Amino acid sequence: MSQDQESPRCTHDQHLQTFSETQSLEVAQVSKALEKTLLSSSHPLVPGKLKEAPAAKAESPLEVPQSFCSSSIAVTTTSSSESDEASSNQEEEDSPSSSEDTSDPRNVPADALDQKVAFLVNFMLHKCQMKKPITKADMLKIIIKDDESHFSEILLRASEHLEMIFGLDVVEVDPTTHCYGLFIKLGLTYDGMLSGEKGVPKTGLLIIVLGVIFMKGNRATEEEVWEVLNLTGVYSGKKHFIFGEPRMLITKDFVKEKYLEYQQVANSDPARYEFLWGPRAKAETSKMKVLEFVAKVHGSYPHSFPSQYAEALKEEEERARARI
């Protein structure tokens, strides 16, 4: 295992980072993005009405993915201000009586949990950009605060958002200190960002396109790809909050990185174009991994798509024989 692939080691940073809830604009932007993108139950990677995606569960061990935060270290964060603590204490005094079971997420207003989830997504991406993984203590202190009993629910939902929208897995890299890191999904090693560029990973968009290509028979016309992306709020030529200008990203950046091939459809007049998996996508991930992602979006299982499952299984068997 290379040094870059080793799990980040949890240590303390003497320069404490403060992440204040005064960043309400960023939280609002994240909340808006979550509403408009992949978590919609109508996300149409394949035809037909879709079910809600199932709750995330531990996946069977695969190869260790390339970390988006390749040199992360842990950090202890401070609370935003004494006034926040006072506000929190006041909220506790104003909270429902102890006789009410507030540990059940169903007894908490949906908008309150949604705000915590959106804020946690924003917080985790911020820590990742700072090359610092996330500790449970950080999340409880800065994000969850008086909602500790709902920690598991909030973390689960934030993890699903990071997975489906940004193409990132939340991994507990140190069970002793409950230290977490964000890792690119499906074995991919490119986050869709140029070197030194500030922003968030664009891997989620790449995974969608790879999924559309596979589900359409290993080649998808440009019209088919944009039909899916349009329904997730991503439009050609229109800057997207997360993905920037998506057409440039898909037809130039992903092609340059050899994740996609973009070519003219044979004998088309007027010229039409199509997408195929590029050599880097074929080398780093597999049809089965992509199918598992598609199935999760649909709230089903890989074998629910018989032809694609048979094709993916055949590829797995061929790769296994090649390793012998």
Curated annotation (Swiss-Prot):
The keyword ATP-binding does not apply. Residues 113-312 form the MAGE domain. Residues 70-81 have a biased composition (Low complexity). Residues 1-22, 39-108 are annotated as: Disordered. InterPro entries: MAGE, MAGE_N, MAGE_WH1, MAGE_WH2, MHD_dom. Residues 82-95 have a biased composition (Acidic residues). It comes from the Eukaryota. Gene3D superfamilies: MAGE homology domain, winged helix WH1 motif, MAGE homology domain, winged helix WH2 motif. Residues 1-15 have a biased composition (Basic and acidic residues). One of its GO terms (biological process) is negative regulation of transcription by RNA polymerase II. One of its GO terms (cellular component) is nucleus. Keywords: Tumor antigen. This is Melanoma-associated antigen B16. It comes from Homo sapiens (Human). The gene is MAGEB16.
